[in-house]
Regions:
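Long beta-strand-rich cores associated with HINT superfamily self-processing modules
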Residues: 543-578
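N-terminal lobe/hinge region of extracytoplasmic solute-binding protein
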Residues: 67-121, 236-239
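Gly/Pro-rich hinge or "lid" segments in bacterial periplasmic/extracellular proteins
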Residues: 103-107, 172-174, 178-179, 183-185, ...
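N-terminal secretory signal peptides
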Residues: 1-27
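Structural transition elements
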Residues: 335, 362-399, 416-423
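Ligand/substrate-recognition segments at binding pockets and active sites
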Residues: 68, 250, 397-468, 511, ...
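Extracellular/periplasmic solute-recognition and catalytic clefts
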Residues: 246-257, 274-332, 355-356, 362
Length: 578
């Protein structure tokens, strides 16, 4: 088979991405020469070594033991550590290594795969597995393990609620929905031990992003078959990540140990990580008592630690992929009128609304938060729903609600949850009343009831948050708002031009061109009032001065573990306390 040639534009794109990862022109030429196909341009940049970079006079602590948790980080006992079967098991991500992982800028880079390539259109992807990839028992972790694990996730017998994550793979959906008898037609095939070939339903330029998602980590087949649902207990677990599970004392503590068989073990400095399972209501007290080296912060604790001279330098904000927004139901008055939907967008005083969040939210003007792939910062788009009370009232001219009168009864419906959701919703109610004279009744529903009504398009106006699953605009736009979805659709709103931009973004191989389609989609959705962005979620943490190695993104912010980035423990190290 003849390999396609690399164009100048593709070479420039590759050079740009490698430069962002710290690779110079000479290094770029070496990497480019080794690419198996131009389809992988941009995905083969390797992360830098995690080896400690000590300051002059600084010494590594003799005991490399990190105490981590509290403030909402692993506040409840995990149901398992089996992300392959249950994405939201609440387990420890550092036990696992996927084919790809995400760097501090949420870009996919090779991990267990040493190289990734594709055909010209991006419909067939090939992952070359590194030959030093091993399980924690020392046995090889191969392409066959990934084939078995991914098909296990799709298997209807697994009853995996998140199996649709793999529906881009050819044959995955019919297999998962029991429309075919077995997995033989699923487009995941190990070509020997070290090559995994994945055939998709069509061009999917973002597929390496999916391969880096936590749901794509492998499971150890012998352990699963021997121990069943108990295979991730500490005594049974065989994993392939930088750490192993030494102890799991349920509802009390998790203890991790460095995995000596991990292919990157030489760059992992920590020997031990202790994660006590601490309820959120315990606050920051364990950190203040020097029982923790690193912790998440809640509202009251944030103010106190940030204001105290002894701790203010330990507090930092970190990027979090979450957005609060409103979805007006276009089938229900008064939101069946686009002028009303646009008026609501102009009536939201976002600066005022986020004040109730005490630093845990910032005003949003689009779906994707800054610092994440696909984020849009375009004045034209920012102006579509800018706060402008006069423009809001002007939008109502010619409608039955001109002058802010004759509003029907309006319910603002939300899910019952923490995370500062209700105060923000109440702040939205206040600004709608102030600037549109629209009185709303807040309806708070149990999550299961809320979800059923959401998918049934039963609510007039919905207050909802979206936490990004994987860092690609396909997730924020296609998975959330695509009008042709047959299930799991959150709103009745449909816009054909919007859908066409999403389809083009999905099917386009070139990264820059894809982002243009998604920016157009954002503009179309806001112009039509398909949704109203209100606030981006922010999170805060504190870290002791002797903890080093946290990675920073291009915005200069520390990045910590979540469901996207999970590289904190391999990078962190401790120095002698002053």
């Amino acid at each position: 088979m003849k390999r396609p040639t690399i164009t100048d534009a593709q070479m420039d794109l590759l050079a740009e991405r490698l430069s962002a990862a710290g690779v110079g022109r000479r290094g770029f030429l070496k990497v480019a020469a080794g690419l198996a196909a131009l389809g992988a341009a941009g995905f083969n940049a390797r992360t830098v070594s995690a080896a400690p970079k000590l300051a002059p006079g600084e010494k590594l602590a003799r005991e490399q033991h990190l105490r981590y948790g509290g403030g909402g980080w692993i506040a409840n006992d995990p149901s398992s550590h089996d992300f392959n079967k249950d994405l939201y098991c609440g387990g420890v991500a550092a036990l696992w290594a996927g084919l790809m992982k995400f760097n501090a800028d949420f870009q996919p880079v090779p991990y267990v795969a040493e190289k990734v390539s594709s055909n010209a259109e991006g419909s067939v992807w090939t992952f070359t597995i590194r030959k030093d990839s091993k399980w924690s028992d020392g046995s090889p972790c191969t392409a066959k393990d990934f084939e078995w694990s991914w098909k296990r996730q799709m298997d209807p017998a697994s009853k995996n609620p998140y199996s649709a994550f793999f529906y881009d793979i050819k044959g995955a959906e019919p297999f998962n929905k029991s429309k075919v008898p077995d997995a033989s037609r699923v487009g995941v095939v190990a070509k020997g031990d070290w090559t995994l070939e994945v055939t998709l339903e069509g061009p999917r330029g973002y597929f390496p992003v999916l391969a880096g998602y936590l749901a794509a980590v492998p499971a150890h087949r012998p352990s699963v078959e021997k121990h069943g649902d108990k295979w991730t207990e500490a005594a049974n677990l065989v994993c392939n990540g930088p750490f192993t599970l030494e102890t799991w004392e349920h509802n009390k503590v998790l203890v991790l140990r460095k995995n000596k068989h991990f292919f990157g073990a030489k760059d992992v400095t920590l020997d031990k990580v202790t994660i006590p399972i601490i309820p959120v209501q315990s606050g920051v007290l364990p950190y203040e008592n020097n029982e923790l080296d690193m912790t998440a912060l809640q509202t009251g604790d944030l103010r106190r630690l940030r204001d105290a001279p002894a701790t203010k330098g330990q507090v930092f904000r970190y990027p979090f992929p979450g957005t609060w927004y409103l979805t007006p139901q276009v089938t229900k008055p008064p939101f069946d009128n686009v002028k009303v939907r646009r008026a609501v967008g102009h009536a939201i005083d976002r600066d005022n609304v986020v004040r109730v969040a005490d630093g845990f939210a910032v005003p949003a003007h689009s779906m994707i938060p800054p610092g994440f792939p696909g984020a849009v910062d375009d004045k034209k788009i920012r102006d579509i729903q800018r706060f402008d009370p006069k423009a809001a009232m002007a939008m109502l001219k010619g409608t039955p609600y001109e002058g802010g009168r004759n509003w029907p009864k309006v319910a603002l419906t939300m899910r019952d949850e923490g995370l500062g959701s209700k105060p923000l919703a109440e702040a939205v109610q206040a600004v709608l009343l102030e600037h549109l004279n629209m009185r709303t009744e807040l309806e708070v529903l149990e999550p299961r009831v809320f979800r059923a009504g959401l998918w049934g398009h039963n609510y007039q106006l919905v207050w909802i948050r979206w936490f990004m699953d994987y860092p690609d605009p396909h997730n924020e736009y296609f998975d959330t708002f695509y009008g042709k979805k047959t299930e799991g659709k959150r709103q009745a709103w449909v816009n054909d031009a919007f859908d066409k931009e999403l389809e083009a973004g999905r099917d386009t191989r070139d990264t820059k061109k894809r982002l243009v389609h998604y920016a157009r989609a954002e503009e179309l959705m806001q112009m039509d009032g398909g949704y109203i962005p209100v606030a981006w979620v922010t999170r805060w943490a504190a870290v002791k001065p002797h903890v080093r190695g946290l990675e920073k993104n291009k915005q200069g912010e520390f990045v910590v573990d979540g469901n996207i980035y999970f590289d904190t423990f391999p990078n962190v190290y401790l120095v002698d306390k002053a």
